[in-house]
Amino acid sequence: MAKYLAQIVLMGVQVVGRAFTRALRQEFAASKTAAEARGRAGTESAAVSSLSGISFQEAQQILNVSKLTPEEIQKNYEHLFKVNDKAVGGSFYLQSKVVRAKERLDQEMEIQSKTSNPKEET
């Protein structure tokens, strides 16, 4: 009786082990394809971040935008630029941060348009 119980447990462990390794291989393959898909855009975005000195997330926070829509970015940019004007008691430092954030988001929109329309790069 104990012999059969041990065989059943052993077979169960083998089945679970095979299923786990199969699932792990599938996950690695999916992760690899996702990384390759993000590869080019991610590299360009990182290069732009290092050149502009401001990250994409920081630029979104400064201009208070969640989606990259030119109208919303422009509207928030104009408002924050006027509010931080030195003539009305604003801060030149904050005003320059607003300008850098808009430049960074404009660059990100350009990168996204290139990756979504690769045929137009010729």
UniProtKB/Swiss-Prot annotation:
InterPro entries: J_dom_sf (IPR036869), Tim16 (IPR005341). It is a peripheral membrane protein. It is found in: Mitochondrion inner membrane. Signal peptide: none annotated. Keywords: Membrane, Mitochondrion, Mitochondrion inner membrane, Protein transport, Translocation, Transport. Gene3D superfamilies: DnaJ domain. Pfam families: Pam16. GO terms for cellular component: TIM23 mitochondrial import inner membrane translocase complex. Residues 58-110 are annotated as: J-like. GO terms for biological process: protein import into mitochondrial matrix. Probable component of the PAM complex, a complex required for the translocation of transit peptide-containing proteins from the inner membrane into the mitochondrial matrix in an ATP-dependent manner. May be required to regulate the ATP-dependent activity. Belongs to the TIM16/PAM16 family. PANTHER family: MITOCHONDRIA ASSOCIATED GRANULOCYTE MACROPHAGE CSF SIGNALING MOLECULE, MITOCHONDRIAL IMPORT INNER MEMBRANE TRANSLOCASE SUBUNIT TIM16. The J-like region, although related to the J domain does not have co-chaperone activity. Probable component of the PAM complex at least composed of 1 mitochondrial HSP70 protein, 1 GRPE, 1 TIMM44, 1 TIMM16/PAM16 and 1 TIMM14. This is Mitochondrial import inner membrane translocase subunit tim16-B. It comes from Xenopus laevis.
